[in-house]
């Protein structure tokens, strides 16, 4: 499963939050740990993945244990479905066991051990480790090591499940193909190496996982209602196939489909369908932006049963130090992303030639050219009104040719609308020297230039058009 972020797995400094129980919740500010890179030795024997695929060595490129799990389990499941009647009790237990094993991954392997998003008492650790073993996705240490590398090197060749290599590679390919340990990005797992329970799980994972994934569901269904075979095929094998591919969807779908409301510097996305099948891991863009937050979303209606489970566990004292990212920083991310979207939209629109790119025209030249061209001067900017049809009549427009119409345009005759100012900007052709001097705008000297968007373009908001005068000039009253 992936939990993406360019900031990668991070240790964190914490601050008490005013939200909820301060003794249980902490705000975290991630700090990327300093982890030395592996040094590549060009004289070292080539890994199989550094050698071309041939008819003689193709089998050496594959991870056969993973191949048996990924391809063998679905075939066993299909055989079981066609040869074993499904009992209602077994179906109910299989669904519950699916949720339990999924929770072992999401609340345990992922948020507890990979990201240290909260701390857990030993009973909760044992409970989650057993559920994670039932998912048969590797030991706590192995899973967390790859996941931390994924966060640190998201979307690069050092990312173990790099989605840039395609959907199928991110989904299952990275497990089918034997990984080159010299090419996978390094991650810091010293905290896991010093945890006796995690290392016990790592050393004895295969027998523990075999029991939890296959033997326990068979015994449970068999001893309670005599359905050993159904317990094995449905609560064991079929459940495991669904758990695996639900988890794999976080590596693949959650990096390809969905929204990016918090950060778009990497491929992580929020995807509701993935959240449904993974107990809340589908809010992946949030997770990659704020990886040490025990939540995968802010709002109550964002589907994240893992968050609810952790919170309830904290009420019973089984979980504590629940990390939450400062809300102010989360809101900043939202605003910045929305600004990016607006900037991309703005970049598609015609805002007229930027003032600094306009030529400088002498006032005498403006007067001379106005004899043959429909030029209008407003606030020091020359506009060529060729082809424009004035809604108030062409007579009003012609009366402004060759003149400074600043006052008339800004309330002297009519206080033109925001749309009129925007439209006028598309007709500008020069700025004048003399008269209303605005050459200074071209260099910015002595003037406060408008803010720029992320594309480097000036942001022109309502009422900030260069042709608008504040406050508008009052029209002359009739005597």
Swiss-Prot record:
Similarity comment: family membership: Belongs to the fatty acid desaturase type 1 family.
Protein name (Swiss-Prot/TrEMBL): Probable acyl-CoA desaturase
CC cofactor: Fe(2+)
Binding site for Fe cation 2: 150, 255, 284, 288
Gene Ontology MF term list: iron ion binding; stearoyl-CoA 9-desaturase activity
Known EC number: 1.14.19.1
One GO BP: unsaturated fatty acid biosynthetic process
Species name: Schizosaccharomyces pombe (strain 972 / ATCC 24843) (Fission yeast)
SUPFAM superfamilies noted in UniProt: Cytochrome b5-like heme/steroid binding domain
Low complexity bias spans: 1-18
SMART domains per the UniProt record, alphabetical: Cyt-b5
Compartments (UniProt record): Membrane
Keyword tRNA processing: no
Catalytic activity, as annotated: octadecanoyl-CoA + 2 Fe(II)-[cytochrome b5] + O2 + 2 H(+) = (9Z)-octadecenoyl-CoA + 2 Fe(III)-[cytochrome b5] + 2 H2O
Function: Stearoyl-CoA desaturase that utilizes O(2) and electrons from reduced cytochrome b5 to introduce the first double bond into saturated fatty acyl-CoA substrates. Catalyzes the insertion of a cis double bond at the delta-9 position into fatty acyl-CoA substrates including palmitoyl-CoA and stearoyl-CoA. Contributes to the biosynthesis of membrane phospholipids, cholesterol esters and triglycerides.
């Amino acid at each position: 499963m992936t939990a993406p972020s360019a900031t990668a797995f991070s240790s964190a400094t914490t601050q008490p939050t005013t939200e909820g129980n301060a003794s249980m919740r902490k705000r975290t500010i991630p700090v990327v740990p300093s982890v030395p890179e592996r040094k590549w030795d060009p004289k070292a024997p080539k890994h199989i993945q550094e050698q071309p695929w041939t008819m003689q060595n193709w089998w050496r490129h594959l991870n056969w244990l993973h191949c048996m799990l990924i391809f063998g389990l679905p075939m066993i499941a299909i055989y079981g479905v066609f040869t074993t009647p499904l009992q209602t009790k077994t179906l109910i237990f299989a669904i519950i066991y699916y949720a339990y094993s999924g929770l072992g991954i999401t609340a345990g392997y992922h948020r507890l051990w990979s990201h240290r998003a909260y701390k857990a008492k030993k009973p909760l650790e044992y409970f989650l480790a057993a559920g994670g073993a039932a998912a048969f996705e590797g030991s706590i240490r192995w899973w967390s090591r790859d996941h931390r590398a994924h966060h640190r090197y998201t979307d690069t060749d050092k990312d173990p499940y790099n989605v840039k290599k395609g959907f199928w590679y991110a989904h299952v390919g990275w497990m089918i193909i034997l990984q080159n340990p010299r090419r996978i990005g390094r991650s810091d797992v010293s905290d896991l190496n010093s945890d006796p329970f995690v290392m016990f799980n790592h050393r004895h994972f295969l027998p523990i996982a075999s029991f939890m994934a296959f033997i326990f569901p068979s015994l449970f269904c068999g001893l309670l209602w005599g359905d050993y075979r159904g317990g094995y095929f449905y609560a064991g094998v079929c459940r495991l196939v669904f758990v695996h591919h639900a988890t794999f969807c976080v590596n693949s779908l959650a990096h390809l489909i969905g929204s990016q409301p918090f950060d778009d510097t990497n491929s992580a996305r929020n995807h509701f369908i993935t959240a449904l099948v993974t107990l809340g891991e589908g809010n992946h863009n949030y997770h990659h932006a704020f990886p040490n937050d025990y939540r995968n979303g802010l709002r109550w209606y964002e589907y994240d049963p893992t968050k609810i489970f952790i919170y309830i566990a904290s009420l019973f004292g089984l979980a504590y130090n629940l990390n939450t990212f400062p809300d102010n920083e989360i809101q900043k991310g939202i605003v910045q992303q929305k600004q990016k979207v607006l900037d991309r939209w703005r970049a598609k629109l015609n805002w007229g030639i930027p003032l600094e790119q306009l030529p400088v025209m002498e006032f005498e030249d403006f007067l001379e050219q106005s004899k043959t061209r429909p030029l209008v001067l407003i606030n020091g900017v020359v506009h060529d009104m060729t082809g424009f049809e004035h809604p108030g009549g062409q007579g009003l427009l012609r009366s402004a040719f060759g003149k400074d119409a600043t006052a008339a345009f800004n309330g002297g005759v009519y206080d033109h609308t925001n749309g009129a100012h925007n439209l006028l900007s598309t007709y500008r052709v020069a700025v004048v020297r003399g008269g209303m001097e605005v050459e200074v705008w071209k260099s910015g000297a002595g003037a406060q230039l408008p803010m720029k968007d992320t594309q480097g373009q000036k942001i022109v908001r309502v009422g900030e058009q260069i042709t608008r005068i504040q406050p508008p000039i009052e029209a002359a009253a009739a005597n």
